[in-house]
Amino acid sequence: DKIIKISLPNKYKKANNERILDIAIGKMYEQIAKVEVERAMEKTRILLGFAPEDYEIRKMNEELGRCEENKITISPEIVKYDREVIDYIVLHEYCHLKYKSHCKSYIKMLEKYEPNYKKYERFVANI
């Protein structure tokens, strides 16, 4: 497991540390997500030859990714996982730009670009 150590300035040590840590970790995830999601989006754009009209990184309650109306939304929580998982989630959402449901054509496209998609599906389902 990876360990992240956060040191707070002395003036915050007696305050509500849990809330401060939640905010700090959230901001850290957002900053890392911006870099990692941008990397994965560009990689997938080059691989597939198309891109969404827009994408955003926004905290979501349960989902790590979503595709609606030619826009992909990715949760900053995605950075808790390996790059392979991030790449898979972005690819998964890209495939939804072409196919809204998990129809046979969608699965065929997903499998074409990620032959091990079932491994990642199982992993994401257990998050």
Language-model features: locations:
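Walker B catalytic acidic pair
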Residues: 93
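Active-site-proximal or metal-binding-adjacent scaffold patches in catalytic folds
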Residues: 1-88, 97-127
